[in-house]
Amino acid sequence: MGRLRVLLLWLAWWLSQAGIAHGAGSVRLAGGLTLGGLFPVHARGAAGRACGTLKKEQGVHRLEAMLYALDRINADPELLPGVRLGARLLDTCSRDTYALEQALSFVQALIRGRGDGEEASVRCPGGVPPLRAAPPERVVAVVGASASSVSIMVANVLRLFAIPQISYASTAPELSDSTRYDFFSRVVPPDSYQAQAMVDIVRALGWNYVSTLASEGNYGESGVEAFVQISREAGGVCIAQSIKIPREPKPGEFHKVIRRLMETPNARGIIIFANEDDIRRVLEATRQANLTGHFLWVGSDSWGSKISPILNLEEEAVGAITILPKRASIDGFDQYFMTRSLENNRRNIWFAEFWEENFNCKLTSSGGQSDDSTRKCTGEERIGQDSTYEQEGKVQFVIDAVYAIAHALHSMHQALCPGHTGLCPAMEPTDGRTLLHYIRAVRFNGSAGTPVMFNENGDAPGRYDIFQYQATNGSASSGGYQAVGQWAEALRLDMEALQWSGDPHEVPPSQCSLPCGPGERKKMVKGVPCCWHCEACDGYRFQVDEFTCEACPGHMRPTPNHTGCRPTPVVRLTWSSPWAALPLLLAVLGIMATTTIIATFMRHNDTPIVRASGRELSYVLLTGIFLIYAITFLMVAEPCAAVCASRRLLLGLGTTLSYSALLTKTNRIYRIFEQGKRSVTPPPFISPTSQLVITFGLTSLQVVGVIAWLGAQPPHSVIDYEEQRTVDPEQARGVLKCDMSDLSLIGCLGYSLLLMVTCTVYAIKARGVPETFNEAKPIGFTMYTTCIIWLAFVPIFFGTAQSAEKIYIQTTTLTVSLSLSASVSLGMLYVPKTYVILFHPEQNVQKRKRSLKKTSTMAAPPKSENSEDAK
């Protein structure tokens, strides 16, 4: 620090001797206390030149605002009475290094004061003292600079000499560091507030994926850094790309910027912290890339509500949202500035250049001639009448900065020079540290009526106006900036006032991923919290929240859009169902036929045909057939405890009763035939009573088993939601049924199927019985056909176990198979007999008796007769 200070002292002394930045390069006002001023009167020069073109608004307007403020303060008898404020106003040429050279002139008086002892000992040859230049003004405080990079460079010098500095435009967050920039203050809020406001705007617009664009330097880079940091802490906003525009951009640099931005086309929102020149060239590159309307700009206060960055580029700027520290147009300055002329404003050395630029004319200087191609200035032109005029946005803050110093000096004067008019010895010279204390303590209403104050870091409170550039009647060139909101610690954005290309009131998206539709969840991309893939909540899952899918409960299915669950419809086989038509038809016809046959047999109970068929077992068999047909109605009926109990009992009872009777009858025929081969003694248990006992004994096993089942597992109805849980939830149904599984159902029929197989075996064995045993072959054909029916039933029944129509197919298959097996028995064994009884009664007579001996001569000697076995 010591070496740097010595170096700066030497450099400042050399500049003072050389006369640099003194005289023609500055605006000077005499006064008891001198304020310094730094303004970007000219743009940065190119090709090695320090300064470029004149900046009418940012430069001249702001400089004149300081002169206007000084005039008002010096004319105010209540503020600093007896003290006149002077000024030394310099041009920074928008370059930090050049501004540093200029700012060194502010410390010349301090250097001279400290070097007087040394200079007194210096003598020229002959003892003549050296010639001295006029002593420079002692600058007590500095207003400026504009760009943050310039303010940082200057602040590093001014703090060494304890000269307070107040900026009217520098907003870099870096300048809030009071340990490094302890003599720096500003009447504009730092970019940390601005960045917070921009984050709030982005979130209010529903954007979560944006890119940032910054001019190289403290302002742009610090602003973007603050935005990124705040957005990261707030969450919900991701940065697609952060692009920096070089301080000295090469040809094609801005086309490269646009190409990089298009690498993430979904990030349409562009947060731009850039100077006016860079903003303009970015818009030009956008037009040349034919991307007008694609990017959605959110500009910082360097864009604000200025026309110059978007002049002739209005189409590209339509929809841009910009931010500007809350300000108001100062009417008094407008009146002051619009009355400035070449005659009454000779103190501003750059005003003639402004005049030529503003009126597009040329002044004739002494010894020269005006350019023939340019109109000659008359000097009678009027600002605002012969040229366009709009007050520059930072004029208010320049005035407030000057007044802040004046109020601080006034408070300091009252404290150090009580009752004294003019400066007192306590303020000569003015101590910079003491003045800084009073600056930080000021609080007054500024030129726009808003409070001016500083916090402990020298920052002003954050208050911003939010604008949007909007087309007028569809024309961008005739559009303008419209106020759409404010920010003061919280955002107030009028969404209805916003206008966009396309649908004027629909905010264009700037999102990494489009919002997921109903019934879809976000599957986040690792490492990019704002990007996701949409994954459908398919099957029986529904969307719980934007990140989660869950399965619906077993008794429910998802809504069509999978945003919730709804009860699964319950179905059953109804009487009106097409699936029930055929089983019911067969059952009705079967019951009618069975009833007719039973009635016929009972009416002709003592006729030879009825007697020969074995009346007792025939009635048992017909009863079983009747029950088989009747079970169809129980299978179609609505399931309940009583129906389910009846199904268990009757499902196997009818078939067991039928096949027990057929087995008993077939076994009797087989035993009689086999016994006849060996002897004439009849086999045991062939009487009708024995046959009934055997039949009911076989049937009782089924009854006992079912009763035990009913006791162990009481019947009840259930709703099975798995049976018709199809791939498509819309087709899912809950099935109301009895609590009988497929295996339970087969188990219920298993015993009767065993009897059927056994009966078939005996029928095969008895196939060689003589024709006198006339029922052997019909029974055989009955059993063969029945076996075929049940063999077909098994694959159909179990092959449809996974079908959505399972309840219908299986019930229909079972009932039809039962009815067909019953119909085969009825048709093979009793229809022919009934036909003879009803239509050929002449054949229902007892034929000649054949003795058992006669009948069995083919196998063994006769021993007895049995009229029941012959027709």
Swiss-Prot record:
Tissue spec. comment: Detected in the outer plexiform layer in retina (at protein level).
An example Gene Ontology CC term for this record: dendrite
GO molecular function, one term: protein homodimerization activity
Membrane topology, Extracellular segments: 24-579, 638-648, 713-742, 801-813
Keywords: Cell membrane, Cell projection, Disulfide bond, Endoplasmic reticulum, G-protein coupled receptor, Glycoprotein, Golgi apparatus, Membrane, Receptor, Sensory transduction, Signal, Transducer, Transmembrane, Transmembrane helix, Vision
Subcellular locations according to the entry: Cell membrane; Endoplasmic reticulum membrane; Golgi apparatus membrane; Cell projection, Dendrite
GO biological process: chemical synaptic transmission; detection of light stimulus involved in visual perception; G protein-coupled glutamate receptor signaling pathway; G protein-coupled receptor signaling pathway; gene expression; locomotory behavior; positive regulation of calcium ion import across plasma membrane; retina development in camera-type eye
Bilayer topology term: Multi-pass membrane protein
Transmembrane intervals: 580-602, 617-637, 649-667, 692-712, 743-764, 778-800, 814-839
Signal sequence bounds: 1-23
Residues engaged in binding L-glutamate: 148, 169-171, 219, 301, 394
Superkingdom of the organism of origin: Eukaryota
Glycosylation site residues: 290, 445, 473, 561
A Pfam family it matches: NCD3G
UniProt KW Transmembrane keyword: yes
Homology family: Belongs to the G-protein coupled receptor 3 family.
Mutant phenotype after disruption: Retinal cells from mutant mice display a subtly altered response to cycles of light and darkness, due to a failure of the ON bipolar cells in the retina to become depolarized in response to light. As a consequence, mutant mice display little or no pupillary contraction in adaptation to low light intensity. Besides, they exhibit strongly impaired responses to moving stimuli, and fail to produce a response when the visual constrast is low. Besides, rod bipolar cells from mutant mice lack TRPM1 channel activity.
Encoding gene (name): Grm6
Organism of this sequence: Mus musculus
Disulfide feature: 51-93, 238-530, 361-377, 417-424, 512-531, 516-534, 537-549, 552-565
Its biological purpose: G-protein coupled receptor for glutamate. Ligand binding causes a conformation change that triggers signaling via guanine nucleotide-binding proteins (G proteins) and modulates the activity of down-stream effectors, such as adenylate cyclase. Signaling inhibits adenylate cyclase activity. Signaling stimulates TRPM1 channel activity and Ca(2+) uptake. Required for normal vision.
Segments of this protein annotated with the region Disordered: 848-871
Cytoplasmic topological intervals: 603-616, 668-691, 765-777, 840-871
Protein name (record): Metabotropic glutamate receptor 6
Subunit structure: Homodimer. Interacts with GPR179. Interacts with photoreceptor synaptic protein LRIT1 (via its N-terminal extracellular domain).
